[in-house]
């Protein structure tokens, strides 16, 4: 009965015991089930934290604080491709293995963090996870692993400090970071967790426990047989105050009981290491997350080395706390996010839209599977018909017979005279349909190009070729929040008045939706002769505020690109762009 009751309340049974959950007080807590419901709280920006390559590019300004990536590996055309992340490194196979020899110890891991392997070179032999392996077998292993995932990376092997251990076992420091308004990131929880399970050494520690040192003790009944379940997590933990970094309590297990202790026992060196470095660590975490206001919640894993600390992972879904309560501010933030999501998903209009979207995608998949060659992205199936319809209506100078021939061979009819396509030479061309069928050539890493903010971070090394990004306006805590971005002048704040000041200073600035194309939702904000203009029409401050405060859209305030007179003479009503297609046949060499 107690087990069923726990599940009904949204907890695992032992969580109910630890937090003393009853029917009267359960609404005061954010349950484990509710916490899982918050997965994906970072929305479309969750993609920044699910792949080590993407994460390192987003946070490239802090590369010295992150795990260093040496190589990325993936399979293309049945062959293993090596991409060197450092220009000084060669991407030739022999050079790759010579580099491993030189480093002596490296990690081979999936880019999604799910698997990692230790590769060492010692005594003139290679070792994989401490087992000797020939270079031929190692090559085969890397090839087979690259075939099972989207890609692999070769990274540095971060060696922890001799002091960074719990009960003699290796440990990791975990931080839960949140940013409720996009401006003030903070640590919501901080603890060190033993990387392995309970040991004989720990049992000896448990024997030394005195009653006066016990803060609380919970009976821990095993309900789950799976070792990796949330409830059966057996690792010792040391919790710290998230504001000061001071030691709070030590969590150990003794028999069937989980015990909170005041005393640190044999872990004084680790405690001092964290406490002495907390101020620097907290400052660094705040500095990092201030640069990514789009990220609202993240888990950060840290390893302390002999030379400082390194961030080994930044991910979307921090672990639910099983031993102590979240602080009030962090708890309120999580509760607000939960309530907001529940309200949205209960909305009838939203439910109808979700149902319609799912039904549409299902129809697309069915239609694509039934009527098209295998491999077509489902939504293209209907778009291709739409393109044919538009082409049929618009190009009236092309005979009906010619149009039908073009459609049967995958071309839109206007392409025929444009490229001189005939019945004799059409096989020399890639048809419109074939090009659509190829989507998405970039596979997973197409996420880099899906919105304007992501590409700005990814390509920040070439910032001078991008418009300046001044502000990002997005919904936070129920209200639109104006968040200064990387190019915002230091003397400006984060109000609508500051955006007007920026327009007065620059003369022209651009207001555009973060996720949009074809100029939809674009405004040119101009200040001239003491008057404001939107798209060259006189406007008031209220007109501008009404656009930017629309909660249904995220807006970017950027530099307005003024084109040269030569292009302006062609058409001055918009920016006339030059489109360039770049491809990399070998995955490395860019070709126009």
For each predicted feature, which ranges?
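Intrinsically disordered, low-complexity linker/propeptide segments enriched in Ser/Thr/Gly/Pro
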Residues: 1, 6-12, 21, 95-100, ...
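Conserved N-proximal alpha/beta basic substrate-recognition cap immediately N-terminal to
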Residues: 1-99, 112-114, 366, 370-501, ...
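Domain-scale recognition of functional cores that engage charged ligands
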Residues: 45-53, 57-58, 72-95, 103-105, ...
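Short secondary-structure junctions
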Residues: 63-64, 291-296, 463-464, 552
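Hydrophobic residues on conserved beta-strands that form the core of alpha/beta folds
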Residues: 66, 154, 185, 297-299, ...
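Phosphate-binding site of ATP-dependent enzymes
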Residues: 101-104, 112, 130-251, 507, ...
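Conserved catalytic-core segments centered on acid/base and nucleophilic motifs
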Residues: 110, 176-177, 300-304, 310-312, ...
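C-terminal active-site "lid" helix and adjoining low-complexity regulatory extension at the edge
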Residues: 252-297, 304-376
């Amino acid at each position: 009965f107690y087990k069923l009751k726990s599940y009904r309340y949204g907890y695992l049974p032992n969580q109910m015991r630890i937090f003393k959950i009853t029917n009267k007080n359960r609404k005061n807590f954010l349950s484990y089930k509710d916490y899982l419901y918050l997965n994906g709280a970072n929305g479309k920006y969750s993609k920044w934290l699910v792949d080590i390559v993407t994460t390192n590019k987003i946070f490239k300004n802090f590369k010295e604080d992150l795990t260093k990536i040496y190589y990325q590996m993936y399979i293309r055309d049945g062959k293993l491709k090596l991409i060197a992340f450092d220009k000084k490194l060669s991407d030739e196979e022999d050079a790759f293995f010579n580099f491993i020899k030189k480093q002596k110890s490296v990690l081979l891991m999936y880019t999604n963090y799910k698997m990692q392997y230790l590769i060492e070179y010692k005594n003139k032999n290679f070792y994989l996870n401490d087992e000797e392996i020939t270079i031929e077998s190692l090559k085969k292993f890397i090839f087979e692993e690259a075939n099972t995932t989207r890609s692999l990376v070769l990274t540095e092997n971060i060696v922890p400090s001799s002091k960074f251990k719990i009960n003699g076992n290796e440990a990791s420091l975990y931080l839960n970071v949140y940013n409720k308004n996009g401006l003030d990131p903070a640590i919501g929880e901080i603890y060190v967790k033993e990387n392995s399970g309970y040991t004989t050494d720990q049992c000896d520690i448990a024997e030394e426990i005195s009653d006066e040192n016990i803060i609380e003790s919970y009976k821990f009944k095993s309900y789950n047989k799976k070792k990796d379940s949330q409830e059966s997590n057996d690792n010792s933990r040391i919790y710290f105050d998230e504001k000061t970094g001071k030691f709070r309590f030590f969590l150990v297990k003794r028999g069937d009981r989980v015990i909170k202790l005041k005393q640190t026992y044999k872990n004084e060196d680790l405690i001092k290491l964290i406490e002495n470095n907390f101020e620097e660590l907290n400052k660094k975490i705040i500095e990092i997350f201030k640069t990514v206001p789009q990220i609202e919640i993240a888990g950060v894993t840290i390893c302390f080395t002999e030379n400082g600390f390194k961030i080994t992972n930044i991910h979307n879904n921090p672990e639910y706390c099983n031993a102590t309560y979240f602080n009030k501010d962090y708890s309120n933030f999580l509760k607000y996010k939960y309530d907001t999501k529940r309200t949205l998903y209960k909305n009838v209009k939203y439910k109808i839209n979700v149902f319609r979207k799912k039904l549409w995608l299902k129809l697309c998949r069915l239609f694509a599977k039934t009527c098209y060659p295998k491999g077509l992205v489902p939504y293209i199936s209907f778009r291709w018909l739409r393109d044919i319809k538009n082409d049929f209506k618009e190009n009236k100078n092309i005979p009906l017979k010619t149009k039908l021939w073009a459609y049967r061979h995958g071309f839109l009819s206007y392409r025929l005279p444009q490229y001189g396509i005939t019945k004799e030479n059409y096989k020399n061309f890639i048809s419109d349909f074939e090009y659509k069928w190829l989507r998405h050539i970039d596979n997973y890493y197409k996420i880099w190009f899906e919105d304007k903010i992501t590409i700005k971070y990814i390509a920040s090394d070439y910032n001078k070729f991008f418009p300046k990004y001044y502000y990002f306006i997005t919904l936070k805590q129920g209200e639109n929040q104006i968040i200064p971005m990387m190019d915002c002048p230091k003397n400006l704040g984060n109000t609508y008045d500051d955006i007007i000041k920026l327009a007065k200073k620059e003369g022209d600035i651009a207001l555009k939706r973060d996720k949009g194309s074809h100029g939809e939702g674009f405004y040119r904000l101009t200040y001239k002769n003491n008057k404001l203009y939107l798209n060259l029409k006189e406007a008031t401050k209220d007109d501008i505020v009404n656009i930017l405060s629309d909660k249904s859209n995220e807006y970017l305030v950027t530099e307005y690109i003024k084109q040269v007179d030569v292009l302006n003479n062609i058409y001055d009503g918009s920016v006339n762009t030059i489109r360039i297609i770049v491809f990399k046949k070998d995955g490395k060499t860019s070709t126009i």
